[in-house]
Structure formats: C-alpha cells, structure tokens
Amino acid sequence: MLRVAGRRLSSSLSWRPAAAVARGPLAGAGVPDRDDDSARGRSQPRFSIDSPFFVASRGFSSTETVVPRNQDAGLADLPATVAAVKNPNPKVVYDEYNHERYPPGDPSKRAFAYFVLSGGRFIYASLLRLLVLKFVLSMSASKDVLALASLEVDLSSIEPGTTVTVKWRGKPVFIRRRTEDDIKLANSVDVASLRHPEQDAERVKNPEWLVVIGVCTHLGCIPLPNAGDFGGWFCPCHGSHYDISGRIRKGPAPFNLEVPTYSFLEENKLLVG
C-alpha cells in the first residue's frame, strides 16, 4: 500500500507547478494547524489539484491554460515558445545588439560622394541611350536592303512604242517608251470625264517615258500591256482598262496605276526608288 500511495503522490506532483511544489507539501500530507490551512488556501495555485485527469481536462477550456501563471513560476523556467504564448505582446521589439552601427559620415566628403553618384547616373543614362538607339536602328533596313530599294535601268535598248517590265521591291514596274502619237492621244483626253482625273503631264517627268507600277488598283492583279479598249493596259481578272497614260478608263478599278518615285540620272539612265 505504501508503494501505491507513493506512485500516486509522485504523479500528482508531476502535474503541479514547480513553485507550488516548492511552497509546501500537498493537502493531507501532514496535519497542519488551522492558521496554516487558511494561509495555504489563499496562496494555493488553481492547478494544484491532485487529480492529473482533472488538470489535463482544464487545459481544453477556453479560459484556462495548463501553463503556470506568472505568480506560479518565473519566465526563466519556461521555454521561449511557451513564454511567448504566455505573455503575447503586439509590439515588435528589434534586437539592436546584433546589428553593427556605423558612425555618421564626414560632411566634408559629401560633395565628392554627390559627384560620384551623379557621374554614375550620367554614365548609366548614356549606356541606356546607346542601347535604345541600337535597338531602334536594328529594326531599320540594312544596307543591302536599301541598295535593293533603288533600281537603275538602262533605257537605250527600249524601242519606241514598246513596254518593258522590271522588278522593284517585289513589284513589277512598267516602263513604256511612247511615240508622238501616244503623247498626243494621252493629252487629248477630257480629264473631267475620268474616274480618277489626272493630267498626263502630272504623271510623267519626260513625255517620252511613262513609268508606272504594274499592279491593278482593284484587287492587285497584273495588267497586260498593249491591250484593252484604250491601247494601254488590260487587267484580265475583272476587266479594268487603262489608257496610254495608265489612267483608269473602264472597269471596276477605282484609281489610276500608281507612279513610283523615279529620276533620270542621264539621258538613257533611269533610277527607280
């Protein structure tokens, strides 16, 4: 029986706070006087009940905790996590002892520091400008593409009344050497009756030579030279007729044949583009 009683006593002591155990023996261990009982009843912690089951059940209560109170045990006896739960504090306390403090700078060196920072920013801005310019210029046409943008044509081999076709920027270009009759016929047309009114002098730089892009203005077909009702070009796709000056005279095309940018380098040298 003494052995069983000792086990019960040790189990009840393991659930009591350390401070409560240090204050005195459990109730019933001895026969104290009446004054000691009243004093112990006032100072006895609330979790000094002998039953371990009852103490554990109180831990599930929303208003009670199995962690000892401040008056029962010191914070030094508890782990850091338990102390944080026991005394929550919304104020953030920074550890200033683990951070190195630097003394304030010398005011006489601030001008040099500002100069270095400003110079660095200027260098960074210049590098950024060069990168932006390089990126923008990389999207422009290269030299070989620009060389193909212009086309030089020798006109000495073209007979009067004939038309030659050259390729410029992926499009056909019609170059026609007109005769005197062709020039008179182009100038005799009533411009007011045309769908897209243009004088013949507005479409040529030299009346002998007519230079137009060989793409129909309707749906982009290639007209046939020396064909149609007006002796110019005829589009076989939808039946558009152009005269000797490349102006639309009949059919669904809304505009005249486009005149590219060109110039005469010499009497028999033509530069398209």
UniProtKB/Swiss-Prot annotation:
SUPFAM superfamilies: ISP domain, ISP transmembrane anchor. It holds the Pfam family UCR_TM. Binds 1 [2Fe-2S] cluster per subunit. Residues 25-46 are annotated as: Disordered. [2Fe-2S] cluster binds at residues 216, 218, 235, 238. The chain crosses the membrane at residues 111-133. Its EC number is 7.1.1.8. Residues 62-110 are mitochondrial matrix. Keywords: 2Fe-2S, Disulfide bond, Electron transport, Iron, Iron-sulfur, Membrane, Metal-binding, Mitochondrion, Mitochondrion inner membrane, Respiratory chain, Transit peptide, Translocase, Transmembrane, Transmembrane helix, Transport. InterPro entries: Rieske_2Fe-2S, Rieske_2Fe-2S_sf, Rieske_Fe-S_prot, Rieske_Fe-S_prot_C, Rieske_TM, Ubiquinol_cyt_c_Rdtase_Fe-S-su. Disulfide bonds join 221-237. Residues 176-271 form the Rieske domain. Residues 134-273 are mitochondrial intermembrane. One of its GO terms (biological process) is mitochondrial electron transport, ubiquinol to cytochrome c. One of its GO terms (cellular component) is respiratory chain complex III. It is found in: Mitochondrion inner membrane. NCBIfam families: Rieske_proteo. Component of the ubiquinol-cytochrome c oxidoreductase, a multisubunit transmembrane complex that is part of the mitochondrial electron transport chain which drives oxidative phosphorylation. Component of the ubiquinol-cytochrome c oxidoreductase (cytochrome b-c1 complex, complex III, CIII), a multisubunit enzyme composed of 3 respiratory subunits cytochrome b, cytochrome c1 and Rieske protein, 2 core protein subunits, and several low-molecular weight protein subunits. The complex exists as an obligatory dimer and forms supercomplexes (SCs) in the inner mitochondrial membrane with cytochrome c oxidase (complex IV, CIV). This is Cytochrome b-c1 complex subunit Rieske, mitochondrial. It comes from Zea mays.
